[in-house]
Every structure is written in C-alpha cells, then in structure tokens.
Amino acid sequence: MIVRTVCRAKEKCLEKYKNILKYKEQLAKQDQKENETTSNNKDTSSSVPKPSNFRKTKVQNQYNRVFSIDEKVAEYEKILNDKVNMIDAIFNKAEKIRDLFIGTEPLTKELIKNELQYGAIVLNRASDLILAFADNNEPREPEFVLNTDMIVNDLKPLLHPTRIFDYSSFGFDDVNKLAINPKIRYLPNWSINYIRKCIQSFFTSNSNIEVQNLHNYSNHYDNRIYEHAMPNDVKLQILIGLDKMFNKLSIQHRFGTFETQILSCFFMKQKICEYEAYMHLPDCVNKSKKLKKGTETVCWQYLAEIIKHYEGIPFYHHTHSSKFGALDNTKISITTNKEVSCCLPSVMHGLLNGIIGELLCDLSTETALIYAKHLMNCSATSTYQRQLEFKDSFRMWPKLCYDSIGYALAVLYSKDMKPLEHRVEKIDSEFWFDEEEKDKLSSSLSKIPSYMKPFVNNAIQNCKKRGDYINQMICDINKIKLSREPNKFETHDLYLESGKNTEYLRWLTMTSTIISNFGIYNKTSLLLEYEKSISTKTKVMVQQPEPKVSLITEQGLQTPILHDWTKVPVLNEMSSLFDSEWKSTLVKEFEDINDFEKRFVTFLTNKSGGIKSEEPTLSKELKGISNARIIAFALNRNDYQIESKFLNMLIAHGKCAIRFQIDRRARVIVIVPNAIQSSELFLLLGFNVLKSDKRFNEKIAVGKQIGNLLDAKAQMISSGDVLSVKNSSDMKGMDAHTLPNLTLFLRRKMIEVLYELDPTGKCARYFFAEDKEYCLIQHHEKYHEQFVRRLRGPTIHAAKCLYYMFSMNMYLEDNFFSKGMNVSDQTFQSGFFATSAQHTLFLSLYLLNNERKYFSKLDNRMIRLLHSVMGDDVFEVIVNGVKYPNLVKEWLKLRNQGLSKINYEEDVSLSRLFGVFLQQAAILGVYVPYPARMSLFCDERSDTTKRHTLDMIKIVLEVLSSKSQRSYAIDNNISIGYAIWNCHRTSRYLYTDRDKSLIRRLVDHDANLDKLFVIDLSKFENSVRLVYPFVTIMTSPISWPMLYFAHFKIDDPNCTILTYRAKSPTSLNGDGAFLLINQMFFTSDEEHMFKFVEFVKHQDKVVRLKLSSDFLDWKERHTWGFTLGEHLLRFKRLRHLTESRKSELGLGEIEVMVHNLNKYLDSHRVQMSLDSFDQLRKNKITVPSSLMYVNHNRAKIEQSLTVRTETLDERASLDSTFLRHVFSYSIVPKDIEVLKTHALCAIKVRTYSDLKYALSVDGYLPESDDSSFNVILPFLPGYHQSSSYGRLFRYTTLPTVHDRDISGTMGEIVGGLGASFDIDSAIEFGAYVYNINRNLINAAASAIGIPQKFVSKYEQLVQAFIMNNFNLKYHSIFHNAKYFGLSGSLKKFSEYGGYSNKLIRFDTINKMEKFHNAFTRDLVFAYIDELNGRRVYLDYSIHSLLLIMSRGSIKYFTTHLYKLFNPLLSLELD
C-alpha cells in the first residue's frame, strides 16, 4: 500500500513540475514576443530595455537555450528518486526520531546529517509527497485507531460542498451598497471550483449565472430565496467577493505551508502520557498510559483521509517569485478536478490545532473525537460562523456540573494571594438567579448535538457520584472521630479525593471551551461584518443635555462648554458623583501640566492614523509611512495652529479597518485621525490620574496586567470563597450600544474640569486655541446672558472638537465586495485614544453611583461588592451573596434596570465557584486556562511567514511556550518545537547573475566548514538551498531545552562515548545555553582552569590565559553546528532594515521631522538627560541611543520605518546581507565579546550524582510553603508532579504580589510618557546600571527622560526586574509568559547552588554573589529533573572568575590572583 502511495505522490510531483515548466516556457515566449514588438516600434537608441528587464530577458533566453524541458524533467526525476529513498529512511527511523525529540534517544551527528536532514528537505520542491506520510502504514496503538467509515461519513459534507448558492443571505442592498443584516457573514461551504466556473462563464458568455435546482432548494429552506429578483451583477459581485475572500482570508499560516506543518506533526510524540498528565483527575476520565504519536491523534486521522481523498493538498498557495519566496495573498490555485470547499483550509487549520491540543493533553482521545466531529458539523455550513453560533450552548453546561458536585476542595488565600489553607467545601447547589435559569439550562441540553450529548450527561452523573463518594468519606471520618483522631493518611486521602473533584470541574470547564474553539482567526469581509460590529444598536434614547454656558465663535455660532445635567436624570447622578469624587483631583493635576501640546505629541505612536498623505512634494518613501501618527503630525504640525485648517482636518474621513480574533467575531476598528485625537488627550490624562491614585483605582484594572498568574488575582481569591457570588458579566457590543450622548458625557465633564483651570496658569495655549478673553453665553431657563471671561486654550480646543466630533464620515475599504465607500454613522469610534478610558471610567462611575444608592438602605449592607473594570469587561464579587440571595437579586435588578436606561445590555453569569475576567478564569481557587485562544499554526495576518527563518522560529517557540503553560502536559512542547524546527529549517535562495559571485563564495566557504549550511545548488533554476544547523535553537538567545546527546570523548584513544542527558523543559532563555552546551566541549589540556591547585603552582600560565581560547574543543563544537548556529542568530536583521530605510528616506527628511518634533520636548529634561549622559559615560556606562530622552522622537520615526512588513525587494537585499554575514563565520569566534561570553560561562556543573563532588552532609533541600498546596491540587493544570514545572514548583512559590504592585507602577510611567515609550528596555538598562553602581540609578532615569516624580517608582521597577533577571555581561531572562505560575526570584534559588572548590575566597570577589545566583538559577531550571531536590555545584574556571572580577577586560594581572585564594589553604600547596 505504502509503495503504491509513494509512487502516486511521485507521479503528482512530476506532473505538477511539467505543468510549471510549460507555464514558464509560455511566459518566456510571451516576453520574447513583446520585446520583439517593442524593438520594431522604436529606434535602436531607445529600444534597449531597462537594465533589470534586460538582465531578466538575457537570463531567460540563456535558460531556455541551454536546458531543454526534457533535461530538466530528467534531473527532477533523479531528485524525486532521491526523495523516495529519503522517505524510506525516514519511515525506518521515524520512531527513533520521535524518541530523540522527547529526549529518550541520544542525538548523534550521524542522525543530524542523515534522517533529520531528510526530514528537513524531503518536501522541498516536492510538496505532494505529503501523501506518502498521510497514507503511511506504520503500526498504531489499537486504542487510538478510529473507524475509517465513520471519518469518511463525517467528512462527506466538506468533501462534497454545495453548488447551490443562496445569494439572498448576503443581504446586499443595491442602493446603498451595504450588506443589510446578512445571514452569511463568513466563508460558506460552497464549492470554490464552481464559484470560479460561474464567474468565468459570466465573462465568456455574459449570460445569467447558472443556479441549479432553485425550486428544490427553496423547498429545503422554506422562507428564503428570491433569486429571480436579484440582479445578475449583484450575484457576480457576491461570487467575485467570495473568490477574493478565499484567496486572501482562507489560509492563515503562522509559518510554513500545510504540507510542512503536517510533516511536523508526523514527527511529534508525547513526552508524558494522559495517565501522567491527568494524575489529579478521577478515574471516571479515560487516561491512556501510552505515549501518543502525532499520527495517532484523532485529528491526524481525519486530516489523512482528506489528503487521501484529494491525493495531496488540493490547492496551491502561490508565492512571489522572489528570493526566499513569500506567500502571495492574491491567488490560490485549485489543483484537482474534485470539488473543493471554501471552508477546507479552515478545517485543515482546525485539525492541525486539534493535533497539538491532543498532544498537549488539552484534549483526550474521547474529547478530541468530539472536537473533530464538531469541526465537521460546523464546516457543513461555515466553519467560522457556525462555531460562533454554537459557542455559548457548548459552554454553559458545566454550571450543571458545578451544581451536582456536592463536595470539592477550595484554596483560600490572603489578600496578597498567599495560599493559606485547603478546605473541603460542601456545595449544596450552584447559585441560580431563579429556578427558571436552571430549568432553561437543563432543557437546553436536548439541543446539544448527538456527538456531544453522552459526554455532557456522563459528566453530570459523574459529578453526582463523586459528591456521594466524598460524602461517604466524610461520614467514615466522622465515625472514626467518635473513638479517636483520624490519622494524617485518612485526612490526606480526603483532601486528595476532594481535590480530584475540583480538578474534574476545571477539566470539564476547559474541555467545554476547547472542543468549541478551533484556534482559527474568524476572518471575513469588512462589508459583511460592518453592521454586526459597529452599526449603532439603539433601543432607548438618552436625552441631549441643554447647554449651560456656550462660546460665541467668530462666525457667530454657539459652541457649548458647560451643560445642565439636571434635565437628564439618567446622567445627572453620575455627573454629581464625578464632581464630588474626581473633579477636584483632576483640576489639581491639570494645573501642574506645563504644556498640553507636548503631552499630546508624547502620546503619538508609529501606528496608523488612517489615510496616507498625497502631498505631491513628498518623496515616495515618505508617503509610504505618512499614515503613521507621529509622521503625519510632523508633516502637518503647522496646520494645527491655524483654526480653519484644523477644522478641515476635524471633518476628514476616518478609516475603517478590521481585526480578526480567535473564538470571537471579527471586529471593525475606526482609525480616528490625529486632529480628533487631540481632544482625546484630556480624557486619557484624566484616566491616567485616576487609575494611578489609590483612592480611586479600586475598580480600575487597567495597567495592572503583567503576564503571569497575578493577572487573575481577583478571580483566584474570590473563587476560593464559595459563600461569595461571582458575576462574570458580559457587556454586549459596548461600542455599538454606546450612544453619542454617552460618548460625549465624560468628554464634556473633562471640559468642565478644564473650565475650572486658572486662566493665568502655566499652560495657556493649545494649538490654534489660545489664552484670552472669550465672549460666552450663560443659558437661563427664560433668558440668556452674555459675559466675557478669560479661558485657557485647551478648554476652547476641546469644546470645538466635540462640536464637530460626529460630523466625521468613515471610509470603508472592503476590497472584496466593493472598492470603497463613505459611510456615516453615529457609532462610538473604537479607535479613540481614550476608548478604554471611556468604557472603564463610565462603568466605574456607573457602578459606584449604583452602590451608593443600594447601600443607602442599611439592610443591604449584609453583602459587600468588589468590582474590577477594564474597558467593557466587568468582574463583580458579591461577598456573602450565597447567604443573602434576595439581596443579590435586588442588586442585580437595580444594576440591569439602570443599564437598560442608557441603552446597554448585559449577560449576567453568576457562580459560587467560578469567575472569569479578561479571559482569565479560576475555579475554587485554582486557575482555569484557555489554551485554544492561542494558536500555534495560525496568525492573524500571516506576518510571520514573511519573516526570515530564524526570526520565524523565535516567534513560534515563544507562542508554543506560552500556549503550553496553559496545558495539562507542558513537557510535551519539547517534541513539538523540535519537529516544527526540523521541518522548517531550510530556505531556498533564488539568485540573479549579479549574485553569482556571492553564491560562489558562499559555496566555497561552506565547503571549508564541512558543508554545514549549503545543501543544494541547482544549475537549472539559479537557486541555492540553505539549511540551518539543527542545534541552532538550543543556542542563545533562543535556548530551547537541550536534547539527549552522545559523542566521543575528546582526546580519548579508546573512543569512549559520553552521554549528556536531556535538559528540563523549564530551561531559561538567555546565556544559560553557553553554560549547558559547553559542558560537552571542555578540553582535557586545559584542566588547570578548573584545578586551582595546578594554577597556584604555575601562575605563569596567566600570560597564556589572556589570549587563550583552548579551554573548548572548537572543532568538535563546530561539527555539531553550535558555533555556526550562534553566529547566524547574531545577525541583526531589524537593524539592517532600519538603516536601509533610513538611507532610502534620506537623512535630511528624517532630521527635519526630528527637529520639528523636538520642539515639543521638555527643555529642562533635555538638559538633565545630556548631563546624566556625561555622568554615566565617565563611569564607563553607555546609554543606548534610542533610549536617550533627546532621541525619543527620532526613535519613534525609526520605529515607523520598521513597522511595515519587508517588501520583496527589501527582503532580497537583506537576504544578500545575511549571506555576507555568513562569510564572517570562523570555527573559533573572532569577536572578542563572543569569546568573553564563552569564557565567563566556563563553569563545570557538578550534580549530586557526580560522587566526587557530592558532600556527605548534603541532604534534601526544604520544599517551599506553596508547594504543599500544589502537590494536592496544582494551581495550573500542568504543574503536577509528572511535569518538570511541578517538580520545579516544589522549590519555589507563586508569583509574589509585589510583582503585581510593580505592574501598576509600570502602567503609571507609560501613562506619563506615552504608549510608544519602550519601558521594558528602559527597565533593563536601569538594571544594568544598578548592577554596576546602584547610586547611578537616578542618572540613568534622567538620561532616558523619566520625570523626577517617577524616578523613585522607576527604581522600584528596576529592583523588581533584578529580582528575576540578570543582565550584566551574562543574561539570565525570566519570561512571565513561560513561567506563568512561578516565582523566578534569583535570591530564592541561590540556596540551591554550592561552590565546588573550597580553595577560592568567593566572598572577596566583587559581584560574585549576583553572578553566582544567576548561574545557579539557570542550572537548577535546566537540571531540575535530575537534581531530586539536591544542590547543584558550580566549578568555576580561572577565566570565569577573572571576568566576573573585571569590568569586562580580559587582561588578567597577577595582582588579581591573590584576591582569589584562601591563604590558609594555599599553605598546603608549598
């Protein structure tokens, strides 16, 4: 069977190749004919083509003259034969490769050069060979094998899509060109073949578009179809739009192609099985004890049937014909005569995501089958749309499980999220708003699809049985208590079994989300989504307040400044509360602002501001980036000073854009022009003030997210209290429900604040509006009174902006069903600077007002309310709510009635056990992650596919690390990462005649380096195939966990094979890779580096040491590919791109913009920055240019140059630069800084298993307090004891609340300096300075422009950073996303590392402790699986110690040596 499949795959490859050659030949003849025609029509002097075209023609003619099609086909057949042999070799060693990727089989150089390389290149130029892998007949575990007939039946609707098109469901209105209430908003399960056939037939015959069996179709769908009434051109518009959507939106790769992604899955295998990953789940959950391969997953088996049906992937995503071809999102060719559904690519994405979910144990075999069946069910109509429609019904049923559980274990916390105790809680029932809610949910189970129903019913019954089981255990313990105290084993069993109940509820909650989320971005047309997303939804009207004071403009118009809120009862109470609680604070803060214009420029970023400038005087390059906000302002800043020009900018078009999301519908964004944003400044500044003030920020959650478990602090703490009610409500379409008067409410209140400012204050002018006497009108009930008052410019500016705010039209550019149109809507514009501020402050104010009214009644104070608000997301904890359900209902009734009066709708979700806020959920005090919300294979814009191979893999591995933190089997990400890397580590470089000398040099250079890099040079296509060393991702800075290595001992005549165990999945990023890798390559002739006795006897060796690199066997290190991999990763592509674009734009253009923008810098801070720069330079500290305050605007402009994706021409140029970078590679690094890093990391690792270095007194280290909680019930699903993370957690704690406090400080500083301020780089630089001299931290803050009032807070941020990170000469990086539930405190881990040499006086070495702590933590994280709770010992070399002692110099002096040695011990050497 497999032989026949390979032969068929080979035939398909050959057939496709011949078609490509014929197509190229036709193009060449066409070009030649056009050139001849051009030559005949022009005289000789003008007939010479442009050099690039001339070169292209010359190459093509030479290409066609030298090599015939037959020769190329013959050569290609040889290549295919070689690939068939590769496939045989891969199949023979497939299991060995999988075991290698999970660290149980040793990696050898032979495996790298043969089978691993075959896996990397087998599909190159032969993608149809994927059929051989899909149809392979390797043995599978019987328990994982599915019934093929069942799969084929499930796939039938997808593989046979409809040819009967329901045009009317798009709701196209031929008058206004909009889709009115469309029933189809996403790609449907229609045949793309037939869509294209219909389009073609229309253009060729100009006849009516054929619609088959309309009469029968109408009978199937009773109330539809008036096809006869729809104009033919509208049908054509719909079909062309769908074809464009299929081309541009259906494929959403993050990397590679479907073929290479599927091949990656072929090599994947679990490191821990379901039985280990589900160790805390009860036995009612099926747990396989077998390690599952990628080919044994449910979704692989579905995917394989699709591939077998079409004999490959039935479509081809074209690439641009450029170097390292990038995907072209304009054309997807169908390569089969069989029907292909528009939904097929989305289904394949969903199946690939399902494979990853099953390997990470997010899905078991049972739930993966439900997932696959649900995917097929949705795709029968529309993958995207049906998933969104089914979503709620698939996720509500776990509440019935909560209601049935009876007993569960809860974690109780202190206010700072320190776990205090485990408590077995009796849960009689869930909290229901009323009986109707429960009955409605119970009855909804009948509507769940048949493939889901048994699972749900069993889950509810299992919960009841588990509750009864715990109840019996409690009864047994109570009986024991009658005669004696229960022993610790009996009580421990109760906690353990109760913990399984909690774990079961968590698993069910996660499962309900995962099986209904395919991990794909729901992509659609802007036109189809417009009405659903942003068209205003109006159920009630909110009255317009009458003006109290108005400005009389020069044109005689009245512009309201102050309003009378008493006539608008629904807002009057909130207005009064604003005045009493917030107003005075805001007035005081605004009085201290020196210049609002400067603050506005601070908030301008390099993000798009809408339409690009069409100014004819601008260069092409500058026009290309003129839509960036900071650039746009720099170009037309003078127009802001002239009122007439500014008002023209106010009524300019905004632009609609669309963002795609996983598990949520597409979201239309209105890109608001800079001019309107200038008035948003005041609300944004006010918001920053209120969220930073502890008196007001109790409800405001913005700026407090730091990327670890503390982001769910409120949910973790409250869910452990089963007597409180958690309301995880959802505000339905808040943007669309925000009426104009609600949009204006807070902005009008901010004008009232500005009105109160002292007119003679520091900041009088704001662009065109200046400080002067203005003619105003006071509106009374029966008369108006004119008066004159001096006002600050910002007051006038804001008032005039609000007056024109809703006169702005929006430009809707769809590019699928229409080219573009202007639409006018009163909807809330989601692109405002202050969008988040608007919703957060409005809801906070609304809730505060309601609380005051509610608690004015004393009886209501039996409950207490805690709120967290961010944007349109609200989390509410009703303390004691379970005890007083009537008070809860009364409160919710008051709250919802108030919301309905202002046009808002809320979906209330109440629970005793569960809470979710900002997609962070918790149940009974443990975290409930949503792993499906992060997709490994899919990307919103597929931007990563356009990146260089090495940049791509960095991003992919970061996503994988973050995603797997939310899974049950975190450790299984190792195999996934290596499988993806191995199948995507090649690049094909197409070169021109101009590059031939470069390629020749590259090939010659590679030949001298054991042919590590170049694997194929094609004489037919002027192409070279490059392969990156397999071990590259193990090197710094990627530092993916090392595998199990085996190689011959250096300088050993007996050829002893040394093995090095695989390192833990918890390994840190950064320079720790140097420590780990070099353990294999220390040379025997440099043992004196580690044997200090020898060194003391022969101190003359210090002379040789200062230039020596002999401590490593560089030749051996090179042959593995480590040194080359490190060299390739040092290529700074972004820096080269920036320089290239700066060169294109011209230094003059940049300097003019910088000069214009620097006028808005604070002159005092500029001087302080320059003075501090000099101070730091005297201390041999260099401030990064981009961080200098005086360069902030320059940095923004340069960032604008790099925001847009590389063009194909730029990519070709950068790739040539990259290849030149390769030439600088040498086996022994020439860069002295690189050698210094190696020398600094010249430390031998000694573990307890190394008996020579184990101390007899070395016992087990004490476990952390938090670990006792985690062992019984893991805080995260994957932190169980079968996981490296669970083992690591035994010696650390949860993230500290101190980190959370710091996150608010970080938000405060960014709020003051603008969103584009690189706070992370600023903190890292501060940490670097702090580690050198903590007294210089103020100078560092001033140099980078931190205002004086934030300096102390900046120092707090720096100190928090150095608790978890180290960046002085050696970089040890702790990413919160990768260690979501762990503290990485360097001080905490310092106790796990010992010094192996007692001869050295480590206490005398400056900064030794800091370096030692960083080295220790890196080694503990890497070796956690083999330390077994004992210390790791560090055997420092002379190189390492002397580099730690020095400020970076490698000139070692004998005087340094006397500091190193313990004089008492030295006497023994004489």
Swiss-Prot record:
Question: Can you tell which superkingdom this protein's organism belongs to?
Answer: Viruses
Q: What is this protein called?
A: RNA-directed RNA polymerase VP1
Composition bias, kind Polar residues: at what positions? 37-50
Function summary: RNA-directed RNA polymerase that is involved in transcription and genome replication. Following infection, it catalyzes the synthesis of fully conservative plus strands. After core assembly, which consists in recruitment of one capped plus-strand for each genomic segments and polymerase complexes, the polymerase switches mode and catalyzes the synthesis of complementary minus-strands.
Ordered alphabetically, the record's keywords are:
Hydrolase, Nucleotidyltransferase, RNA-directed RNA polymerase, Transferase, Viral RNA replication
Q: Which reaction is catalysed here?
A: RNA(n) + a ribonucleoside 5'-triphosphate = RNA(n+1) + diphosphate
Q: Name one Pfam family in it.
A: CPV_RdRP_pol_dom
What would be the name of the gene that encodes this protein? S1
Which GO terms of the molecular function aspect are on file?
hydrolase activity; RNA-directed RNA polymerase activity
> EC no.?
2.7.7.48
Lineage, broadest ranks: Viruses, Riboviria, Orthornavirae, Duplornaviricota, Resentoviricetes
Quick one: where's region Disordered?
28-55
Top EC class of this enzyme: transferase
